[in-house]
């Protein structure tokens, strides 16, 4: 009948009382442009051999997934790796995360501070504070992961890349007045502002090119995104 059992998964946001927690900066903030706020989070994907973990960064304004990483652990270095990938698109003013140890520990905090990124953390138990990425998790789980039942991390990486590419570049989004996330994110950007060929080759080697760089025809008028 095509039914899929969904079992409870591991907690991905366990805190550490020794780590640094910053205030939540998004309450009452008017978010009007791409690269003003990015949000990061982790979700799990169950394979026959065990769990793998999907890290993703979403641009709050456009819903564009600026970077993602699929890893066999949920340690902080994979969060930093994901942010490093995203920096080809620019540096956000604010990056919001939950209070998991990956995003409150020294490795993550130091990396953001060195880039002059303002750090924002959700309140304890308040997943609604990071609602953009939570809604994306719901979308990718129910429209891709639960339907395809990936068997290997290689298969999952390829399939997730194809889905994220579709989500970014082809799928109209109701909250964006049926624009695509990429149309909003890249509106007014020149080709020179897009990732370099060298970086494309790096992603190709990692098997993640599918999600990132498809030629985009912008079909609406928007204000230019600050470089």
Question: What feature does the model see in each segment?
Answer:
Residues 15-17, 97-99, 103-112, 119-141, ...:
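RNase H-like two-metal-ion nuclease catalytic core shared by retroviral integrases
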Residues 31-66, 72-73:
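An active-site-proximal beta-strand-loop segment
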Residues 50, 68-90, 94, 101-104:
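Active-site beta-loop-alpha junctions of metal-dependent nucleic acid enzymes
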Residues 63, 95-98:
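Buried hydrophobic side chains on well-structured beta-strands
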Residues 64-68, 119-122, 146-147:
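Short small-residue beta-strand/loop micro-motif enriched in glycine and branched aliphatics
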